[in-house]
Amino acid sequence: MALEKLGKALNNALRKLARSSTVDEATIKEVVRDIQRALIQADVNVRLVLDLTKRIEKRALEEEPPTGVSKKEHIIKIVYEELTKFLGTEAKPIEIKEKPTVLLTVGIQGSGKTTSIAKLARYFQKRGYKVGLVCSDTWRPGAYQQLKQLVEPFGIEVFGDPEEKDAIKLAKEGVEHFREKGVDIIIVDSAGRHKEEKSLIEEMKQISAAIKPHEVILVIDGTIGQQAYNQALAFKEATPIGSIIVTKLDGSAKGGGALSAVAATGAPIKFIGVGERIDDLEPFDPKRFVSRLLGLGDIQGLLEKFEELQKQQEFREEDLEKFLKGKFNLKDMYAQLEAMQKMGPLKQILQMIPGMGYSLPDDAVRVGEERLKKFKVIMDSMTEEELEHPEIINYSRIKRIARGSGTSIQEVRELLHQYNQMKKMFKSMDKRKLSKMARKFNLGGFGL
């Protein structure tokens, strides 16, 4: 998950509150200090942290919770609301109003711009849009080839000419090429040679004048932390149609600093990069993002992922219900894990369920691709009866399965252990408690 370290630290602060016997001024101040420490360690600007935590402390000390809501729950809601406000409050999606809509992307060298463009193209393609990419990066050797390699498996065309040195000419020709082809969205990749904001903005203005984009997107590297403020501010002041993608939030300790710095400028964050896969680009919604960060889940995000799986006809509603109630067998487990894998790691999906958050044992959910392949080989050596009723698998059956699959007894046991862990985990979920929590945080019902 994006900003997992920060999320765990914030979640621990809220757990401390939940475990305390009384909620007095000292308890509130201690929780606020924990939140301050977590945010400062994530490279969030100290002044911004102090302003935020002062608001949290003031509200927590002065506000009376509504009827039916405990003081602890109300303080958690205050933390959720203030963090959401801190990161921009509302989601601001890219609007596709005209055909074609032209998007120009810019970014400092090493920001992850080219990869983000491929992810953005895939994001729109999955939503039914026909997308064309224009590579006008004439500076970086291999930029055109890299972009082609990333999107060709998905049938997305890239216009470019590695021999051409005039970026503006390439951008104009590329936009015209895709206009004639009748695509819905044209994404233009600009040069990635700039090491500072001034020259980047100069080029952005030149290309913008030539191709007249509907929106200009600045790609910011999340690992630069609060330094992102200067980039975002200079960009916001230079164009009225600008939006931002913050990348590399999956592995950076400074991602919180980058996100908060950009939000402080008022520049709209449209997407965040949360992993290396081409599907690891998320529309940025502060409410849903903070909800996941605090371990409160993201029901809307979960439903959207399952809807995508259903569109691929790999995941039916009754399958999902069986899975979430812990009433699945080995056959179901493999089919659903394989389908879920296409939408991201299982842990990422389970973190969208309120209450699961950071309490998930990693061993119970981190089923990597290699292990999945091995599990399939093992399951291929099982009988239909064993797949449907794993409880009948005794030691002699384990020996036979291991022999037939070319694996060890230990590996067969590992599969069965993984299966039992997952069943146990899902069965232990308190559905009523989670539903009550979701309603209190206006996170929507989730029909479990």
UniProtKB/Swiss-Prot annotation:
Keyword entries, A-Z: Cytoplasm, GTP-binding, Hydrolase, Nucleotide-binding, Ribonucleoprotein, RNA-binding, Signal recognition particle
EC number: 3.6.5.4
Subcellular location: Cytoplasm
Biological processes per GO annotation: SRP-dependent cotranslational protein targeting to membrane
Signal peptide (from-to): none
Annotated S-S bridges: none
Transmembrane segments: none
Superkingdom of the organism of origin: Archaea
InterPro entries the record matches: AAA+_ATPase, P-loop_NTPase, Signal_recog_part_SRP54_M_sf, Signal_recog_particl_SRP54_hlx, Signal_recog_particle_SRP54_M, SRP/SRP_N, SRP54, SRP54_GTPase_dom
Catalytic activity: GTP + H2O = GDP + phosphate + H(+)
Keyword presence, RNA-binding: yes
Function (record text): Involved in targeting and insertion of nascent membrane proteins into the cytoplasmic membrane. Binds to the hydrophobic signal sequence of the ribosome-nascent chain (RNC) as it emerges from the ribosomes. The SRP-RNC complex is then targeted to the cytoplasmic membrane where it interacts with the SRP receptor FtsY.
Subunit structure of this chain's protein: Part of the signal recognition particle protein translocation system, which is composed of SRP and FtsY. Archaeal SRP consists of a 7S RNA molecule of 300 nucleotides and two protein subunits: SRP54 and SRP19.
Record's protein name: Signal recognition particle 54 kDa protein
UniProt organism field: Thermococcus onnurineus (strain NA1)
Name of the coding gene: srp54
